[in-house]
Design a protein with these regions (language model features):
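Transmembrane helix-loop-helix hairpins at the membrane interface
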Residues: 47-150
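Juxtamembrane helix-loop-helix connectors linking adjacent transmembrane helices
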Residues: 1-74, 82-83
Length: 150
């Protein structure tokens, strides 16, 4: 089995995460833009403060927590990853419609696969990669909200 270096996994994760979201934005119908406009009028400090906390918690719960609980309780980190993808994609985003569910499922799938790969090397790097990618995605979303939402 071929193993990839940590940097290749992190770069591939970044490419798949942002490239996949870009491709989905071209294919999927646009969602409700009234939420985007409401967020654009929020104070930026509040938006970033709440957003960072929410995105970090999402990454820790639906990726790290789900996989580690699956590994500990069922002795199957892959089962935990599947639960995390379903939980983040379906449970957390079902109210946003099909576009939201598809995009969230893609994000969770990429991050959970990356975490499973990096976890074999070092859990600390896997956690930092997951949280870092979630924060990078949040910063991209914040840029879109404050640039195009007004």
């Amino acid at each position: 089995m071929q193993t990839f270096s940590t940097w290749k996994v992190v770069c591939l994760t970044t490419f798949l995460l942002f490239g996949g979201i870009w491709a989905l934005a071209l294919v999927l119908p646009s969602g409700d833009n009234s939420k985007l406009q409401a967020l654009a009028h929020a104070p930026i400090a509040l938006f970033i403060g709440v957003g960072v906390a929410v995105y970090v918690l999402e990454g820790l719960v639906w990726t790290v927590g789900a996989i580690e609980l699956g590994a500990r309780l069922a002795r199957s980190p892959r089962l935990g990853a599947a639960v995390g993808v379903g939980g983040y994609g379906l449970l957390s985003h079902w109210s946003g419609g099909s576009s939201s569910v598809i995009a969230a499922t893609w994000i969770a799938l990429v991050l959970n696969c990356s975490y499973l790969t990096l976890r074999q090397r070092c859990k600390r790097i896997a956690i930092l990669s997951t949280v870092g990618h979630k924060l990078a995605y949040f910063l991209m979303a914040a840029y879109v909200v404050y640039t195009y939402g007004a």
